[in-house]
């Protein structure tokens, strides 16, 4: 297993009951700046992304009773949901991690340049770690989320 940095921290995902309420705190108290909002009823979530001095926070709210966000909130309450790393050649890195015995879940390809998976919290001391590449810039966010 390599000990070189896996990639750049892209964003911190936080599960919340209400993105509107959480947004008030992040903007009003911390001074964050709204980037965009996205809703995915099929996957059962709404998210907003906020910038705070170059760090992106992704706030996730459940939509519907079978939402992964709702299940998370019921089990753990509001708080850290995941860390996302932008990893060059993520498909190859994910294969390498699996080869090294790291338990991965939720592997999927959005396009040839956009591939992701999650390191299981059981393998990473309780933290869900998302590894991917091709994450959207603000200008591409709306187009990317249509995939």
Enumerate the predicted regions with their spans.
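Long, hydrophobic N-terminal alpha-helical segment
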Residues: 2-45, 52, 67
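Short, charged/polar surface micro-motifs in flexible loops or helix N-caps
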Residues: 53-57, 64-66, 90
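N-terminal beta-strand motif that seeds the catalytic metal site of vicinal oxygen chelate
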Residues: 1-21, 78-87, 136-147
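Vicinal oxygen chelate
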Residues: 2-5, 16-24, 48-51, 58, 63-64, 75-147
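Regulatory and interaction patches adjacent to catalytic/ligand-binding sites
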Residues: 72
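Short connector loops at helix/strand junctions that flank enzyme active sites
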Residues: 45, 52-54, 75-80
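Short, structured motif recognition centered on aromatic/hydrophobic residues
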Residues: 9-16, 23-26, 50, 57-60, ...
């Amino acid at each position: 297993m390599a000990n070189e940095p896996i990639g750049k921290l892209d964003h911190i995902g936080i599960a919340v009951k209400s993105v509107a309420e959480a947004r008030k705190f992040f903007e009003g108290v911390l001074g964050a700046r709204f980037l965009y909002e996205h809703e995915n009823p099929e996957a059962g979530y709404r998210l907003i992304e906020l910038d705070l001095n170059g760090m992106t926070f992704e706030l996730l709210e459940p939509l519907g009773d079978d939402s992964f966000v709702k299940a998370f909130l019921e089990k753990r309450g509001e708080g850290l949901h995941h860390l996302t790393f932008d990893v060059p050649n993520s498909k190859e890195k994910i294969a390498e991690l699996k080869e090294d015995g790291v338990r991965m879940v939720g592997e999927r390809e959005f396009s040839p340049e956009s591939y992701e998976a999650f390191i299981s919290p059981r393998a990473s001391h309780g933290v869900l770690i998302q590894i991917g590449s091709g994450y959207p810039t603000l200008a591409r966010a709306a187009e990317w989320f249509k995939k």
